[in-house]
Regions:
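Short beta-edge/loop segments at beta->alpha junctions of small alpha/beta modules
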Residues: 1-39
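Hydrophobic/aromatic-lined pockets within catalytic cores
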Residues: 2, 6, 58, 109
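Short alpha-helix boundary/capping elements
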Residues: 6, 61, 131-134
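Short gly/ser-rich loop at a beta-strand->alpha-helix junction or flexible surface loop bordering the NTP-binding
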Residues: 10-14, 41-77
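Secondary-structure transition/turn motif
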Residues: 21, 89-92
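Structural motif
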Residues: 42-45, 91-99
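A short, charged helix-loop
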Residues: 78-90
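Hydrophobic alpha-helical interaction segments
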Residues: 94-201
């Protein structure tokens, strides 16, 4: 069937049924390509993030051949069909209730590397995403961010302060940062007016 073009091979023992389009054979959905890397025995072990979800977050329109997966333990990148699958170590536990927030935090983490968009444009979109989170989700996002690196917490703090969240959340993030460390993040003060308060340069 593979030789007849009815199904396409992804990797050893993994195939998908391709549809013909005007541009050629369709790609399989990202989730189908990596399903076995996201769940094992009914338990979540990873989640799509980075390049894989920038489109759904309206952070980029670019389609990438790299699929990124958040996992709790380091794994080497692998190749599967036309896709490269890269793994990002996630220090928080992975469960259905926090995947959405982990994806947002990963976008903050890689703000300077999001394709086909400037850091300022990405920051404007992140401001909107943070603003649309419920107060409860904002609290959970802050809690999850505490396991990320300092500059992610600083950028989250600046964004949250700009959108006017409760002081308790701002204080929690400020206390988690080292006294005089500065963070080089390429976002302008015109877009993020609170950046200097968080020692972002």
């Amino acid at each position: 069937m593979v030789t007849q073009g009815k199904i396409q091979k992804l990797s050893k023992g993994k195939f998908y049924k391709a549809r013909k389009t005007e541009l050629g054979l369709s790609r399989p959905p990202a989730r189908q390509v990596v399903k076995d890397l996201l769940e094992k025995d009914g338990k979540l072990i990873g989640y799509l993030t980075g390049y894989s979800i920038y489109n759904s977050l309206y952070l980029s329109t670019q389609i990438s051949n790299t699929l990124q997966i958040g996992v709790n333990k380091y794994r080497r990148a692998i190749k599967r069909g036309q896709y490269k699958i890269a793994f990002i170590v996630q220090p928080n536990s992975i469960n259905k209730s926090n995947i959405e927030l982990l994806q947002v935090l990963d976008a903050v983490r890689f703000i300077a590397r999001i394709p086909a968009i400037t850091p300022d444009e990405a920051c404007l979109r992140l401001l909107q995403i943070f603003r649309e989170l419920s107060p409860e989700k904002q609290k959970r996002l802050v809690r999850l961010s505490l396991k990320y690196t300092d500059y992610v917490r600083a950028l989250c703090g600046a964004i949250l302060e700009q959108i006017g969240v409760e002081k308790e959340l701002i204080d929690k993030l400020k206390k988690s940062l080292r006294g005089i460390t500065t963070y080089k993040i390429p976002v302008s003060e015109k877009v993020l007016t609170t950046k200097s308060e968080w020692r972002i340069i």
